[in-house]
Amino acid sequence: MSHQSSLIAEDIESYLQEHEQKDLLRFITCGSVDDGKSTLIGRLLHDSKMIYEDQLAAITQASRTSGTTGDQVDLALLVDGLQSEREQGITIDVAYRYFSTDKRKFIIADTPGHEQYTRNMATGASTASLAVILIDARHGVQTQTRRHSFIADLLGIQHLVIAVNKMDLVDYSQARFDEIVAEYREFAAKLNAPDIHFVPLSALEGDNVVNKSEAMSWYEGPALLHLLETVEVTHDKNLTDLRLPVQYVNRPHLDFRGYCGTLEAGILRPGQRVKVLPSGKASTVARIVTFDGDLEEAYPGQAITVTLDDEIDISRGDWLVAEDAEVPLADAFEADIVWMHDTALEPGRLYDLKLATRDLAGKITRIDYQTDVNTLEHHAAERLALNAIGRCRVEVAGTLPVDDYRVSPGTGSFIVIDRMTNVTVGAGMVRGAAEGAGNTGEVDWQAFEIEFNALIRKHFPHWEAKDVRSLFGQ
């Protein structure tokens, strides 16, 4: 089955050790409806020999009832797992697949192309380092192509591979490929992505997916898989600005107090001076503890427990940063928000926000503008409908450190949660502290919360509950 089947059979320990040392690339496939995203992933798995025999037999059988490729095996069925997806021939949910080659491990997120599932695409893109954006060679750059490119850029994906698919349907025309490249480059001039590659391919026929195509001898670049194996993503991590959001305080006994969390940015070492935000108290790192023993250095993505020389007040939601770091503290910030719910975002409503490891109440007080994903122009808006993207002012209850998403995605992103249904209704990328933001911590309480608080104070006076309005200066 696999390119390493013989090694697995002969020496499983060597295989596991070799597999552990490979670096990992997370990437998404996106584009307009029926551009061939699922077929492309199926082709990657098939031609890199990462399909089990029973899987191949299953999709061969399914191709007779749900396939769209005639007598050929419909490789898209490897990814389109939902029954409704197979019946409609489209991708609805984000489908994840895993495979590896001799050089690298991969996690693929196949995201839906339909506009009403843009929120699913944003979810898949949030953890990716690279985006493969498919364009149908017959249709060129479409609205959804621009939308997905903009979302990928918004979420900080620095590497874009523009895969011009279905080249077999335009007779492998170099002129058509060059025309699409020029059209996309004109649009991409408005994006921030520093690394863009273009590959002409046919996922159905396998041209330029894993192996170079004989039908497109005019194309001198690498096949798609070679690009995925060689793209350099390690330098994308921020190793300068230390950020460790505290997930919980580990206190197994009286002689140990550790602060657990995933290092989001920077390099942490024992003996390093750090300070806690938002309190500003400073201390020195004593140990970096992990399940496998103490570390001399910790890097972004590692889950660690940190002990300090001093006993200072630290709790869930606080950040550990470098002692000399200048991180603004504010009760309001500017953010780009992708709205993910049928009920539109209307300024003034109170929501729950989850930012890094901190949970807090907040509200979107103003929509500065909505971005037209076709032209990237800004337009005035009073509300954000489903799948809309806008720049907003967010005010929160309390003071918190504010990170730009481009500095540290882990501490500069948040989700918006409806307080009544507990449904995630939006996702946001922080762009900095809001102009005129203070640290008053004021919040506009909903009527039912004020009434509920009053009932508790009336009927349970022994609880000594405080008036929520007085607590926040209302």
UniProtKB/Swiss-Prot annotation:
Record Pfam families: GTP-eEF1A_C, GTP_EFTU, GTP_EFTU_D2
EC numbers for this chain: 2.7.7.4
Record keywords: ATP-binding, GTP-binding, Nucleotide-binding, Nucleotidyltransferase, Transferase
Statement: the UniProt record of this protein carries the keyword Transcription regulation: no
Chemical reaction(s) catalysed: sulfate + ATP + H(+) = adenosine 5'-phosphosulfate + diphosphate
Region described as G2: 89-93
Pathway this chain belongs to: Sulfur metabolism; hydrogen sulfide biosynthesis; sulfite from sulfate: step 1/3
Limits of the tr-type G domain: 22-240
Sequence intervals crossing the membrane: none
One GO process term, biological-process aspect: hydrogen sulfide biosynthetic process
Region feature (G3): 110-113
Chain residue ranges for the region called G5: 202-204
PANTHER family (alphabetical): TRANSLATION FACTOR
Self-association state and partner proteins as the record states: Heterodimer composed of CysD, the smaller subunit, and CysN.
Protein family according to the UniProt entry: Belongs to the TRAFAC class translation factor GTPase superfamily. Classic translation factor GTPase family. CysN/NodQ subfamily.
Function recorded in the entry: With CysD forms the ATP sulfurylase (ATPS) that catalyzes the adenylation of sulfate producing adenosine 5'-phosphosulfate (APS) and diphosphate, the first enzymatic step in sulfur assimilation pathway. APS synthesis involves the formation of a high-energy phosphoric-sulfuric acid anhydride bond driven by GTP hydrolysis by CysN coupled to ATP hydrolysis by CysD.
Protein name: Sulfate adenylyltransferase subunit 1
Gene: cysN
